[in-house]
Design a protein with these regions (language model features):
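Gly/Ser/Thr-enriched, mixed-charge loops and adjacent short helices
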Residues: 1-120
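Structural signal for hydrophobic packing residues in well-ordered secondary-structure cores
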Residues: 1, 23, 27-42, 51-52, ...
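Core alpha/beta catalytic barrel or barrel-like domain that forms the active/cofactor pocket
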Residues: 2-4, 89, 129-136, 231-232
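Ser/Thr/Gly-rich flexible loops in soluble cytosolic domains mediating phosphotransfer, phosphorylation
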Residues: 1-23, 152-177, 265, 269
Length: 426
C-alpha cells in the first residue's frame, strides 16, 4: 500500500482552497454556457442582462432544501445572488429526511415556501430539492391562483424543461437552413414529450433506461445533423442541457426562468402559437403548466412501480409475458375498446441507444426495455405499459402512461400488466 509523506500531504492541503476556487469558477463559467446555449461572452452578457431587467421589474426568489446535499458546497447560492435572485435554503448541513427528490420528500421545501410567503417573501416562485450528490433535483412552484406551493411530478418537471429548451433552441436557430431540432429521452418517458415536440416541429428519439444511453444517443443524433439541446430521463425529472452531459438542477431552474422572463415574442408565446392555444401576455408559471398536454403517469417511486420477480432470466420471463398478454388480449379486446377506446397495440423495445418498433418477439428485448403501446381507431397512441428488469436486484420496474386525466385507466392498465408479469413469473 502507498502512504504519502507529511510534506506531500501538506502540499495537497496548501492548494485545496485555490483548487476549490478554480473548480467553482470553471463550473460557474460552464453553467453560463449551458444556460445561454453559447460560449460567446457577449451573447451571455446580453442574455443575463435581459434576465436582470426582468427581475428588476418583477423580483424573483428561489428556495432550496439542500437536505445535506453536496450542492450546498457548490455555486448555487452565489449564482442566484449574482442574478439578483433572492435565495433561501433549509437543511444546509444535514440529511433531515429521505434523500430521493420525489413528491413525498418535496413536502419540506413546499412547506418552507409557504412559510416564506406568510412572512411576506412573495417573490419566491420556485423551489427545488437536490439529491445527495447534487445532480438531480425536482421542483416546487408557487401557484398564484391557489395561493399555495405545488409539487410538480417528475414527468411534469421534464416536460416544462423540454418546452423551455426546445422553444429556446428554435428561438436561437430557426433561421438556420439545416436546423433540425430533436429531443432524446429514455423509453418510459411520458408521451406528453412527443406531443410537445410534434407541435414545435421536433423529433423525439428514445434510448434504454440509463443516463449514459440517453447521452450517447444524443451524440449519435448530433452527428446525424440534429440539434439536441435538451435530453434526459423524464421518468425521474432529470434535465440534461447541452453541452452538459449530466443532470443539473440549476439548468432546470433556469429553463423555467427562460419561460417566465422572455415575454414579447417569447418562448411561451411561441408555444401557444404553435400548439393552437390562446396566449395571455400576463401569464404566470401556472398558466404555462396548464397549457401542457395532460397525461396520467405512474410515478417511478410509487410502490406499485416495483414488482418483485423470481425469474432471473429476463428473456424467458418476457417470452412467457408475451404468451400471457396475447391470450388475455383475445379475451379483453372488446372490453378495452368499449372502456378505453383501445383498438390495437404495438410492441417496442429499447436496447442501449437502439429503439425497435413493431417487434413480434418480446423476448428479443432481453434485459432491455419492453413497451406495449395501445392505439385508438385512428392508430394514434393513447397509452402504454412498460417494463424493464433490474440488473442488480430481483425486481421489474413497471409503469403506465395514459393520454388525458384518466386515473382509473392508468390504474387498470398497470394492474393488468402486474397480473401478466406475475402469471409469467410462475
Amino acid at each position: 500500500a502507498y502512504s504519502c509523506t507529511t510534506s506531500e500531504l501538506k502540499a495537497v492541503y496548501d492548494v485545496k482552497d485555490s483548487s476549490k476556487h478554480n473548480a467553482l469558477s470553471a463550473y460557474r463559467n460552464f453553467a453560463n454556457e449551458t444556460i445561454t446555449g453559447t460560449d460567446n461572452k457577449e451573447y451571455q452578457t446580453d442574455f443575463f442582462g435581459m434576465l436582470d431587467t426582468f427581475i428588476a421589474q418583477k423580483p424573483l426568489g428561489v428556495v432550496c432544501d439542500f437536505n445535506g446535499s453536496s450542492r450546498y458546497q457548490s455555486i448555487d447560492r452565489e449564482f442566484f445572488k449574482e442574478r439578483k435572485i433572492n435565495f433561501y435554503s433549509i437543511n444546509d448541513f444535514e440529511i433531515a429526511h429521505e434523500i430521493i427528490p420525489e413528491a413525498e420528500n418535496l413536502v419540506h421545501v413546499a412547506a418552507e415556501m409557504e412559510r416564506l410567503h406568510k412572512e411576506g417573501h412573495n417573490e419566491v416562485v420556485l423551489g427545488y430539492m437536490p439529491d445527495c450528490d447534487g445532480d438531480r433535483g425536482n421542483i416546487v412552484y408557487w401557484d398564484e391562483k391557489q395561493k399555495k406551493a405545488v409539487i410538480l411530478k417528475a414527468q411534469e418537471v421534464f416536460s416544462l424543461s423540454v418546452l423551455a429548451e426546445l422553444t429556446y433552441s428554435i428561438w436561437q436557430h430557426s433561421d438556420e437552413k439545416d436546423f433540425k431540432p430533436a429531443v432524446v429521452v429514455n423509453c418510459p418517458t411520458s408521451m406528453r414529450i412527443n406531443e410537445i415536440a410534434s407541435a414545435l416541429g421536433a423529433q423525439v428519439f428514445r434510448a434504454e433506461v440509463g443516463e449514459a444511453n440517453v447521452v450517447n444517443l444524443a451524440r449519435e443524433k448530433r452527428e446525424q445533423g440534429y440539434t439536441v439541446r435538451i435530453l434526459g430521463e423524464g421518468s425521474n425529472g432529470g434535465t440534461i442541457t447541452y453541452p452538459a452531459a449530466v443532470r443539473d438542477p440549476l439548468n432546470t431552474i433556469f429553463a423555467l426562468l427562460k419561460l417566465l422572463m422572455m415575454r414579447e415574442c417569447g418562448l411561451y408565446e411561441m408555444w401557444c402559437t404553435k400548439s393552437g392555444q390562446k396566449y395571455n401576455p400576463d401569464f404566470t408559471l401556472s398558466d404555462i403548466i396548464a397549457s401542457l398536454p395532460v397525461y396520467t403517469t405512474t410515478g417511478v417511486s410509487e410502490p406499485r412501480a416495483v414488482l418483485k420477480v423470481k425469474t432471473t432470466d429476463h428473456t424467458k420471463l418476457k417470452a412467457a409475458f408475451q404468451k400471457a398478454f396475447e391470450a388475455d388480449w383475445k379475451k379483453k379486446s372488446g372490453e378495452l375498446k368499449n372502456k378505453y377506446g383501445i383498438i390495437d397495440w404495438e410492441a417496442v423495445i429499447t436496447k442501449g441507444t437502439v429503439e425497435t418498433c413493431g417487434v413480434k418477439d418480446f423476448s428479443t428485448s432481453e434485459k432491455g426495455g419492453l413497451k406495449i403501446i395501445f392505439k385508438d381507431k385512428d392508430s394514434k397512441p393513447i397509452a402504454f405499459i412498460w417494463m424493464r428488469g433490474s440488473g442488480t436486484e430481483p425486481v421489474f420496474r413497471i409503469m403506465c402512461d395514459v393520454k388525458g386525466n384518466k386515473v382509473d385507466m392508468e390504474k387498470a392498465l398497470l394492474e393488468w400488466e402486474t397480473e401478466l408479469i406475475k402469471k409469467a413469473d410462475k
